[in-house]
C-alpha cells in the first residue's frame, strides 16, 4: 500500500470543485429512481420527460445530502445508442459529472493532451441562469460531463422541472443521512489500470493519491491491483482497479465479463453516523455483503495492541456487519451492498471516516472472501479458462 504526497504543480486555471452528479442509463428510469428512493433514502429532486418537452430521453433526478443521481431511459424504440448500451452493459453508470471552474480551459488542455472530446463546450439556460457543459470520454463507454454554473440558482440544471409526483411512502421511512460521494471506483480489464489512471493524470491534471497491488490484496483464489487518482484539492477521488492473475476468476474479472468491459464498479457514499445509517438502510430492506464472525474475533484481538480507539460499540458493528480499517492515525468504517441490479456489476459502499484517508486496504482480503462466496452462489468462482459470459447465450 502506497500513499503519495506529491500532488504536482497546482493548475493555474480550471479547478475541479467536487462530484456534481452521477448519471445512470437504465431500462426503466421511473422504477430505478423509485428503488433508490425506497431502499437507499434518496428523494426526488427534478424531472425531465415528455411533459417538459424532452421527446427522446426521460430523466428522474434524485438527491440525498449533496449526492445527486440521474436515472435516464430512452423514450423511443429507435434510440440505438441507449439501446446498444443497455444490451452490452445492463443498467449502470454512464456519466460522472464534475462541477468545475473554467470549463473551456479544462477542455482546451485535455484536447491538447489527446483526450477525446465527446461534446465541445455549450451553454444551456432558463429563467434561473446559465450553465456551461462539456463531455469527455474516459474508460470503457463511461464519460465525464464538466458542469460550470454561471450564477445558476435552479433546483438542478436547465430543462429540468420539479418532480411531477410526490411519493407518500417516503416520509414514513427512516432517514439514512448519506451526505456526499466519497469516491467512485472504475474496474478495468487486466493490464488496463495504468493507462486508465494515466488518462486522469495527463488530461485532467489529477495526481496519484494511493495504490495497492496484488502482493497485498489476494486470497487463495484471486487478487487485484488498484490506483487512486485525485484532483489537486483532493475533493474528487477515483480508484481504478484491475484483476490480477489468480487460480480463480476474481470479482473484478466477473464485473468486466458481465459489464462487457470497463465501467463503474461502485460508488462510495459518506455518512457521519454509519450505525444509524445502516440500521435504517437494513430496515428499508437493503442487502449487504455478509462478514463472518471470525473477522470480528480477529479485529478485537488486533485492536488490543493498537493505539487507535474505535469509538463505536464493537458488538453493534458486528451485528450490522460493518468493517473496520485503521492505521496509526485513525480508522474508517465501511460496508458494501450486494449488486444493485441482476447483473453482478454496480454496487454501493457506505463509509464513515475518522481521520483516515485510505480505502479499506486492511479489509480487502476479507471483502474478497465475501465477494467470492457470492460469486460461488452465482456459479462464477471458476477457473478462468472454463467460465465466462458466453456471447449468444
Swiss-Prot record:
InterPro entries: 4OHPhenylPyrv_dOase (IPR005956), 4OHPhenylPyrv_dOase_C (IPR041735), 4OHPhenylPyrv_dOase_N (IPR041736), Glyas_Bleomycin-R_OHBP_Dase (IPR029068), Glyas_Fos-R_dOase_dom (IPR004360), VOC (IPR037523). GO terms for molecular function: 4-hydroxyphenylpyruvate dioxygenase activity; iron ion binding; protein homodimerization activity. Binds 1 Fe cation per subunit. Its cofactor is Fe cation. Pfam families: Glyoxalase. Its main location: cytoplasm. Pathway: Amino-acid degradation; L-phenylalanine degradation; acetoacetate and fumarate from L-phenylalanine: step 3/6. The modification N6-succinyllysine is found at residue 132. This is 4-hydroxyphenylpyruvate dioxygenase. The gene is Hpd.
Amino acid at each position: 500500500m502506497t500513499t503519495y504526497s506529491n500532488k504536482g504543480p497546482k493548475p493555474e486555471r480550471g479547478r475541479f470543485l467536487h462530484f456534481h452528479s452521477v448519471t445512470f442509463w437504465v431500462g426503466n428510469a421511473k422504477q430505478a429512481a423509485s428503488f433508490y428512493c425506497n431502499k437507499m433514502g434518496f428523494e426526488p429532486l427534478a424531472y425531465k420527460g415528455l411533459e417538459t418537452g424532452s421527446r427522446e430521453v426521460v430523466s428522474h433526478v434524485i438527491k440525498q445530502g449533496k449526492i445527486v443521481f440521474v436515472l435516464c431511459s430512452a423514450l423511443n424504440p429507435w434510440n440505438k445508442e441507449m439501446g446498444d448500451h443497455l444490451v452490452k452493459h445492463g443498467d449502470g453508470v454512464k456519466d460522472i459529472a464534475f462541477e468545475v471552474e473554467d470549463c473551456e480551459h479544462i477542455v482546451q488542455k485535455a484536447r491538447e493532451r489527446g483526450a477525446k472530446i465527446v461534446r465541445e463546450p455549450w451553454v444551456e439556460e432558463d429563467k434561473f441562469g446559465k450553465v456551461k457543459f462539456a463531455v469527455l470520454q474516459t474508460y470503457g463507454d463511461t464519460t465525464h460531463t464538466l458542469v460550470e454554473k454561471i450564477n445558476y440558482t435552479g433546483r438542478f440544471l436547465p430543462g429540468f422541472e420539479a418532480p411531477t409526483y410526490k411519493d407518500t411512502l417516503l416520509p414514513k421511512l427512516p432517514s439514512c443521512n448519506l451526505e456526499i460521494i466519497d469516491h467512485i471506483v472504475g474496474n478495468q480489464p487486466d493490464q488496463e489500470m495504468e493507462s486508465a489512471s494515466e488518462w486522469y493524470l495527463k488530461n485532467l491534471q489529477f495526481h496519484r493519491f494511493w495504490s495497492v497491488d496484488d502482493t497485498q490484496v489476494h486470497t487463495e483464489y484471486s487478487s487485484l491491483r488498484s490506483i487512486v487518482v485525485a484532483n489537486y484539492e483532493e475533493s474528487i477521488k477515483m480508484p481504478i482497479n484491475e484483476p490480477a492473475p489468480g487460480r480463480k476468476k476474481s470479482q473484478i474479472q466477473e464485473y468486466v465479463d458481465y459489464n462487457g468491459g470497463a465501467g463503474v464498479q461502485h460508488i462510495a457514499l459518506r455518512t457521519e453516523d454509519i450505525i444509524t445509517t445502516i440500521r435504517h438502510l437494513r430496515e428499508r430492506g437493503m442487502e449487504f455483503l455478509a462478514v463472518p464472525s471470525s473477522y470480528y474475533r480477529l479485529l478485537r484481538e488486533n485492536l488490543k495492541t493498537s493505539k487507535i480507539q474505535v469509538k463505536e460499540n464493537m458488538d453493534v458493528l458486528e451485528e450490522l456487519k460493518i468493517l473496520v480499517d485503521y492505521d496509526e492515525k485513525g480508522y474508517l468504517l465501511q460496508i458494501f451492498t450486494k449488486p444493485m441490479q441482476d447483473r453482478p456489476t454496480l454496487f454501493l459502499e457506505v463509509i464513515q471516516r475518522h481521520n483516515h484517508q485510505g480505502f479499506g486496504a486492511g479489509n480487502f482480503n476479507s471483502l474478497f472472501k465475501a465477494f467470492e462466496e457470492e460469486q460461488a452462489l452465482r456459479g462464477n468462482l471458476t477457473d478462468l479458462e472454463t467460465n465466462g459470459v458466453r456471447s449468444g447465450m
